[in-house]
């Protein structure tokens, strides 16, 4: 049986702009990652660890499922 890959999407870019147009650098500093990692997350090229996903959600004062979700 072939495993179906789960595609996780996110609303990080939208949340940054809705949060006083937070820069990628500001978010990176808040959660302890590089700006390049923020770019990769926003472009769906990198799926963050569960711990990092929670840190990002907390940075926006959101529940994790409001930031990261499965698109089927």
Task: Give a label for each model feature.
Residues 51-66:
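DNA major-groove recognition helix of helix-turn-helix/homeodomain DNA-binding modules
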Residues 33-47:
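Recognition helix of helix-turn-helix/homeodomain-like DNA-binding domains
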Residues 11-30:
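Short basic helix-loop element that most often maps to the first helix and adjoining turn
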């Amino acid at each position: 049986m072939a495993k179906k890959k789960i595609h996780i999407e996110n609303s990080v870019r939208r949340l940054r702009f809705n949060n006083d147009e937070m820069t990628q650098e500001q978010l990176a500093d808040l959660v302890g990652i590089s700006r390049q990692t923020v770019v990769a997350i926003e472009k769906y090229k990198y799926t963050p660890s569960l711990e990092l996903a929670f840190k990002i959600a907390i940075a926006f004062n959101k529940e994790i499922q409001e930031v990261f979700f499965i698109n089927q």
